[in-house]
């Protein structure tokens, strides 16, 4: 009989808050979301994807930059996006990214990411309400929700999107 003693590290996850990014500015439309977050996105010369987590009242809980890419693409890991939503105890989320090239039209990869994130959110019970693309150097945006391009599985959430209140308390 062996007297081997096993030592296991106990691990824990803690939410560490950084500087406040959301103010009391009321944001109800994709243009307002982009306008508010554009100051953050303007700092980058490459594609940046962020996630805005929402609570049960559809108010923002937080915002996290979950991917930084190259000039023409950002690798959006569903794991990183959903980790932010789960750790924030979010009831839903919006993803937003910029297109430094100046066009807000979604690429095939953007459409794929929207579909994957919609399915991941549905599986975890944290719905994706919108994916917004902001073109650099202009006010041009593309909202998958407003264009009716959200995946079919998300249509059951569509009635709640109009109630999203992107204003912090």
What is the predicted function of each stretch?
Residues 1-15, 19-23, 32-35, 55-57, ...:
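Active-site-proximal loop/helix of nucleotide/amide-processing enzymes and allied scaffolds
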Residues 48-49, 129:
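Short loop/turn microsegments at loop-to-beta-strand junctions
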Residues 162-169:
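A cross-taxonomic marker for long C-terminal extensions/tails that follow the last structured domain
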Residues 42-45:
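Short loop/turn motifs at secondary-structure junctions and domain boundaries
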Residues 28:
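Extended substrate/RNA-proximal surfaces in nucleic-acid metabolism proteins
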